């Protein structure tokens, strides 16, 4: 085993019994021969399961929609690429000459895919418990920053993502009334969601605020949020 791979193993916190599994996980499809796409597929499935299982246990009061959003934050490419950079993973990737020249070792998608491939490789090299332990260790800081309140996304975005996850039509917003003087108006908006029998309503000093209030009301009516999230 080369010294460089040994350094990577120390960073990952795992020593491979089968070095070939590790090398394959680090091999991009632009490189000649076999590549890490199958391992990436396996690692992605393991990552989603482990993250989902941990969230299920960590947030016993969370609804399905909340758990889905939290998991999406944990397993998104940006998060995985950040972890990969912490391991200096780009230095160990096997890339084709074209990909190497174009800076593929820095590309978010390539780094994230390689990290997922390493998860799959660890599972095959050891077992599920070992893969779970490594995933949870790598994501420990990410878990610490999670709360049920996702302050990074507004109600309209959360509602849209919830509906898209179920292949539903996007919500429709309509201003049904405007009251008050031009300098002090109140907008009244209705939000129509295909999964709800009744339209959700919101009001605010601008159309945008009224739509956000209506979207928040729709999320509560859908049971995705309880009003205290």
Swiss-Prot record:
Q: Which terms are listed as keywords in the entry?
A: Cytoplasm, Endonuclease, Hydrolase, Magnesium, Metal-binding, mRNA processing, Nuclease, RNA-binding, rRNA processing, rRNA-binding, tRNA processing
Main localisation: cytoplasm
Q: Which SMART domains match?
A: DSRM, RIBOc
InterPro entries attached to this UniProt entry: dsRBD_dom, RNase_III, RNase_III_dom, RNase_III_sf
Catalytic activity from the UniProt record: Endonucleolytic cleavage to 5'-phosphomonoester
Its Gene Ontology cellular component terms are:
cytoplasm
- UniProt GO molecular function: metal ion binding; ribonuclease III activity; rRNA binding
Q: Which CDD domains match?
A: DSRM_RNAse_III_family (cd10845), RIBOc (cd00593)
Cofactor(s) this protein cannot do without: Mg(2+)
| Coiled coil ranges | none
> For Mg(2+), which residues are the binding ones?
40, 113, 116
One GO biological process term: rRNA processing
Q: How does it assemble?
A: Homodimer.
Biological role: Digests double-stranded RNA. Involved in the processing of primary rRNA transcript to yield the immediate precursors to the large and small rRNAs (23S and 16S). Processes some mRNAs, and tRNAs when they are encoded in the rRNA operon. Processes pre-crRNA and tracrRNA of type II CRISPR loci if present in the organism.
Protein name, UniProt field: Ribonuclease 3
Whose protein is this, by species? Pseudomonas putida (strain GB-1)
Q: Which gene encodes it?
A: rnc
């Amino acid at each position: 085993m080369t010294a460089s791979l040994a350094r990577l193993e120390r960073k990952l916190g795992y020593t491979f019994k089968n070095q070939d599994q590790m090398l394959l996980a680090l091999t991009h499809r632009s490189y000649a021969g076999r590549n890490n796409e199958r391992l990436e597929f396996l690692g992605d499935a393991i990552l989603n399961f482990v993250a989902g299982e941990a969230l299920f246990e960590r947030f016993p009061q969370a609804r399905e929609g909340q758990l889905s959003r939290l998991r999406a934050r944990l397993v998104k490419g940006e998060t995985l690429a950040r972890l990969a950079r912490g391991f200096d993973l780009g230095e160990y990737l096997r890339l084709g000459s074209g990909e190497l020249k174009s800076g593929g070792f820095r590309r978010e998608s390539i780094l994230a895919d390689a990290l997922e491939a390493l998860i799959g490789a660890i599972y095959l090299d050891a077992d599920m418990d070992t893969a779970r332990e490594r995933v949870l260790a790598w994501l420990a800081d990410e878990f610490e920053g999670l709360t049920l309140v996702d302050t990074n996304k507004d109600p309209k975005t959360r509602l849209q993502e919830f509906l898209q996850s179920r292949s539903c039509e996007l919500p429709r917003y309509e201003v049904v009334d405007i009251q008050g003087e031009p300098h002090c108006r109140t907008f009244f908006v209705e939000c129509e969601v295909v999964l709800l029998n009744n339209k959700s309503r919101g009001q605010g000093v601008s159309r945008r605020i009224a739509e956000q209030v209506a979207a928040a009301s729709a999320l509560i009516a859908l049971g995705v949020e309880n009003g205290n999230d």
